[in-house]
Amino acid sequence: MTETTERIVLLVPHTGRSSNIESAVLAAEHLDRAGITVRVLVNEEDDPIKTHPVLGRFEHVIHSRTAAEGAELVLVLGGDGTFLRAADLAHAVDLPVLGINLGHVGFLAEWESDSLEDAVKRVIDCDYRVEDRMTLDVIVRDSDLEVIGRGWALNEVSVENLNRRGVLDATLEVDFRPVASFGCDGVLISTPTGSTAYAFSAGGPVLWPELDAILVVPNNAHALFTKPLVVSPRSTVAVESMSGTSPAMAVMDGFRPIPMPPGSRVEIVRGKRPVRWVRLDSLPFTDRLVHKLRLPVVGWRGPDKQKELLDAETPDQP
């Protein structure tokens, strides 16, 4: 990066709590003092950022495909929902995205709020690495196979029944061959990154993010064969609604919906463009999983500890 190149960071804060605003101020001021232009995402409605004495003086943008244009990085301060919305902006212009957790579990965040200053310094120093996370590309077709919607997802595509008094009658399809038909509340098609989110709550397995695969999880399906499936990343997964069933919705990452009238189908393939994910440490995913989900590991000794015990029990040879 040359000295004459303007450095810009898009700051995406969750403003639901006063402590979150304070974190956004800290990050913005550190970046500003380092000579980095700060651009702040705001809501179209009343947003406390617009009138804040510090955050109000920075450039403000609303959520759009061009919000992150010209920036070098998207910095997210919030939980998983905030991260997914920020990832939508970063993905549109192929930028890296870094999440700092200000929420509860914050599975998508790289670091916690108590390390915010260190994280911002790493951004200032360009001291981070970027890894690609698999995404999904989505097409919705009507009963005549005409395209009526397109989208993408980082976590999952949730095919949801809109009639809470009945079930969604659907057929699951892999590589244009039928797998099973059933009545259900919906079907989740997830990436490895999204396997710890909605798909996990619906009974799906956890997939390590380095794995290239597509996870399919029927949601409250009424059939003998309703087990989760892990299919090839080269496959096309489709969910086809029956012509006489309830209307449905294909929802990407919880906030980008495409209506699915009866008889329509949604087709999902591996995304052409990944999300560029900022990493600040080399912590194994196993450790992150245990920490975020607070999994009990009491009594674990590990190979190093077991070796010490074996060495202590082995008598010295003459």
UniProtKB/Swiss-Prot annotation:
Under the heading InterPro entries, the entry gives: ATP-NAD_kinase_N, ATP-NAD_kinase_PpnK-typ_C, NAD/diacylglycerol_kinase_sf, NADK
Q: What is its EC number?
A: 2.7.1.23
| Pfam families per the UniProt record, alphabetical | NAD_kinase, NAD_kinase_C
What's a GO biological-process term for it? NADP biosynthetic process
Q: Which GO terms describe its cellular component?
A: cytoplasm
| UniProt KW keywords | ATP-binding, Cytoplasm, Kinase, NAD, NADP, Nucleotide-binding, Transferase
Where along the chain is the active site annotated? D80
Q: Which cofactor does it need?
A: a divalent metal cation
GO molecular function terms here? Answer: ATP binding; metal ion binding; NAD binding; NAD+ kinase activity
Report the locations given in the UniProt record.
Cytoplasm
Gene3D superfamilies xref list: Probable inorganic polyphosphate/atp-NAD kinase, domain 1, Probable inorganic polyphosphate/atp-NAD kinase, domain 2
Q: What does this protein do?
A: Involved in the regulation of the intracellular balance of NAD and NADP, and is a key enzyme in the biosynthesis of NADP. Catalyzes specifically the phosphorylation on 2'-hydroxyl of the adenosine moiety of NAD to yield NADP.
Name the protein family: Belongs to the NAD kinase family.
Q: What is this protein called?
A: NAD kinase
